[in-house]
Amino acid sequence: SLFLHGIKSHVYVALRLFAEVWAAELGRSVDNYCTAPIAEVATLRGWGELDKLIKSSDNWSAEKRYYFIAKMVCHASNYGMKPPTFRLNLLQKSEGKVSISQAEAKNFLNTYHDLFPEIRGWHRETVDTLRRDGVLRNLFGYPRVFTSIIDESMHKEAFAFVPQSTVGTITNITFTKMQQKIENPKIPAP
């Protein structure tokens, strides 16, 4: 829904995780952006200013790079990362400049999953399919067979397969059509 309404997920997550920071920077409450239906957020007065502020935090001092932190939360959550691993990953990616507590890591990841509960549902569905069939398929139906023992260590790889393989297939189809058009300009455009 965010994508359809022109809102980057990283921006929205940063908004929700660090609302007090944005309120202090703007000198006004941002509660209306946090409580509005997603379809209305970008239409609210002042959204453009807030959106730019959140993105600009990527250029603030390392410990205040809230957009970066939110981006890391999104990626970690999408791959099913647990709080201890997320803490270490954030510390590594920030070159040792962003250190958060275990409680903060848990809160950040839980906030993301509260905002997007369908992600955990998709994770469960993916693991169930993997355990049952040993095969996952991308959105074009292309399979990936998992031949080793199915355990938690391979969940990240399983979660990554469908979206990454689907994008790879789309790219392949697009380049094939472009090459065909180059070689035969009379082929109608799709």
What spans do the regions from the language model cover?
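Conserved catalytic core of nucleotide polymerization and phosphodiester-bond processing enzymes
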Residues: S1-P190
